[in-house]
């Protein structure tokens, strides 16, 4: 992932911690651009990026172990301010000659931090504050030149500083909400230590991205994959703002869309925005490929590959089509696995592309989280209907029908999902609930309808609250609204006699079921 040129940024090095993406988000929320990069990045690469500051993330390993994640030691010699969090503080301490050992017991949860001669990192903060600890190791002796400026009963070296080198470390996690003044600590690192200006905004992002798209594309043409979701819609609007009629949008109706989706896409982009939109009817082609396939990863790969093959075939009929634009998000890349994390699930936008694909990929929003994409859509002048459209995965209903896909199952999900969205909107909850949809598990149950025994499908409802999709909680939909949804589904959708409600957060679950 490329850093944005001519723009101050904070570089976050990924050492595998569960809160790493939160660090990046917190920094952006403070008006400074930030990106998460592998700990394997070289000092030369860091120098080229020229960040205003560097943050070492937390991580699950021990710095003294053979399999410890390390960074290029020359990064410490670049003269760039460094802030180490948890594992990051331990790594920095070890590098400069400090000692890191196994703690007597793991410390996890809230703790009280007491400050002594605090650094600029703690400017205007109380000398005693609540922080969030999550560690099994601790620094037992600080390196020469470093001073302890924060202690805790269970962790005597909870915060360290070397003001001459502008290097700071904390054993706790300022990026989580449980740390009372965590946001203020990060703010002080950005503005007191790194001297950032805090001028990053979505308006600024648009200006930079339009310039980048113009430079990258030149006088060539771009083919944009429209899916009907907010991500591809925003990508189309952004690229159209940059290159106008050099953009052609292709909308593939793969038979896995929500009710009314195809008509809505054509009306919005072809009629309202006057974009060049080509509609491809490929329902039979996709569904034939998916016959007999139950494994979710296989389904994702098949749908992703078939998308590209269709585009490849259709684009060959067009002239000078060099680029394929996709609505890949930052969360897509993160969830598809990094050096330090296992793949949770492959995303259609970052996996399954054939090696002989004729296009060069252009992914202008792949550094943004979902809520930032919505903000971008507003800045680009998209309607609320588009901006607040429910998130919809590229594989569509193909991963909301669990197991093998059939026409009957697709119709059940399509109709039940329409009812859910309709009732949520009627209840005025569409802005309060981050994402909501129905799924069809491979499950039948006994029921009674009209004095007759039934043996029909159970429909699952998934509704979550979230900010960026990295974590989420199940939505507390009022009981009366759930009752209306349930009654309508079992009465209006054929072959359904039961409705289930998913009350699991992320983690441990993902938002989508497949």
From Swiss-Prot:
InterPro entries, alphabetically?
A: Class_I_gatase-like (IPR029062), GATASE (IPR017926), GMP_synth_C (IPR001674), GMP_synth_GATase (IPR004739), GMP_synthase (IPR022955), GMPS_ATP_PPase_dom (IPR025777), NAD/GMP_synthase (IPR022310), Rossmann-like_a/b/a_fold (IPR014729)
The GMPS ATP-PPase domain covers 200-389
PROSITE patterns noted in UniProt: GATASE_TYPE_1, GMPS_ATP_PPASE
The annotated pathway is: Purine metabolism; GMP biosynthesis; GMP from XMP (L-Gln route): step 1/1
Q: Which residues bind ATP?
A: 227-233
Annotated active site = 86 (nucleophile), 173, 175
Q: Name one GO cellular component term.
A: cytosol
Keywords (alphabetical) are:
ATP-binding, Glutamine amidotransferase, GMP biosynthesis, Ligase, Nucleotide-binding, Purine biosynthesis
Q: Which residues cross the membrane?
A: none
Cite a single GO MF annotation: ATP binding
From the UniProt record, list the reaction(s) this protein catalyses: XMP + L-glutamine + ATP + H2O = GMP + L-glutamate + AMP + diphosphate + 2 H(+)
Q: Where does the Glutamine amidotransferase type-1 domain lie?
A: 9-199
Q: What is the protein name stated in its UniProt record?
A: GMP synthase [glutamine-hydrolyzing]
